Amino acid sequence: MVKRLLLTLLTLILLDGLVPGGTMVDEPQTDLNKVGFRYLTTNGIRMHIAEQGSGPLIILCHGFPESWYSWRHQIPVLAEAGYHVVAPDMRGYGKTDRPEAIDEYGMLKLVGDVVGLVRALGEEKAIIVGHDWGAAVAAQAAVMRPDLFTSAILLSVPYGSRRNGGSPPMESAAKMPGPKVFYQVYFQKPGVAEAEMEKDVRRSVLAMLYYASGDAPAATRFTGFFDQQAGILGSLPMPEKLPGWLTDSDLDFYAGQFRESGFRGPLNWYRNIDQNWRMGGFLLDAKLRQRSLFIAGEKDLVITGFGRGGFDRLEESLPNLSKKVLIPGRGHWIQQEAPVEVNRLLLDFLSGK
């Protein structure tokens, strides 16, 4: 019963690999020297973007807890392939505006941000790519504006068509029995998760990135549930060393971003889950009909746990899905953990393969 509820929750909420020992078997060629930065106004906020290249527009939407930098291995490769690649700091993150009110982070606002971004860039069409929460935004943007987004690539979080019936996801999740709490329920009360995470930002980011990755031992890999008394970070002991895909410089960059922005804006995305559900009735049975691609890690907590049902039903919700790929040995941060493989899949899809 609990497992079935969890599989349903993800749909409602989001309207080679690593060898043993953590050794990388692929080495990304990442050169950010040609990446430019600027601010654009979209949907009433000032958005900070990283961009490179010229040609058809590709928008890369990151998730939690990330920034434009999570696409550092993809931006140069896609630009070299002949695309204008734009990776924004999403609303509430990094150098992008972070409105105070919780309702400023609802899905319609987030979709409006990327729609407005296309127009602010002077374009009429775009390919949209998203990871984690960014995959939810990308999917909803493609569903709501098929005239604007010509194709969609989703990483880690599957899109599921809205189904009839049910109840607000967080209300349902809060009633689940057992001693542990679902992390998205823990994020609901303003100020609680922020206070825990902002005590030691670098440690917080490292814990979340490591324990949802393919490097974390199976016994300690984050499942989405934890002892509320210990807190989410208290349940995740510090790893002895960084995984091969995350350097000290990478971690320092992320920590700097969240010291600047704080966690309130990003956590406010979660605080709109039930409101997104209440406002999403018009999306009943809505399918993402553009050509699409799905990529995730074989060890991703979404795929192995509460999102498995959405993954298994992808072909129903994405009738023009060209391929769905699980990369062996990898976890939730797929474009960072397996950049060479992800880049190959992106380029193959973009070339029509």
Give, region by region, the residue ranges found by the protein language model.
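Positively charged n-region of N-terminal signal peptides that target proteins for export
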Residues: 1-4
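Bacterial N-terminal signal peptides
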Residues: 8-17
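Flexible "cap/lid" subdomain of the alpha/beta-hydrolase fold that forms the substrate-access gate
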Residues: 27-35, 46-47, 93-129, 133-322
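Short acidic-hydrophobic surface loop/beta-edge motif
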Residues: 38-42
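A short loop-to-beta-strand scaffold at the N-terminal edge of the catalytic core in hydrolase folds
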Residues: 43-51
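Conserved HGGG/HGGXW glycine-rich cap/lid loop of the alpha/beta-hydrolase fold
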Residues: 51-97
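Catalytic active-site module of serine/aspartate enzymes centered on a nucleophile-bearing elbow/loop
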Residues: 321-353
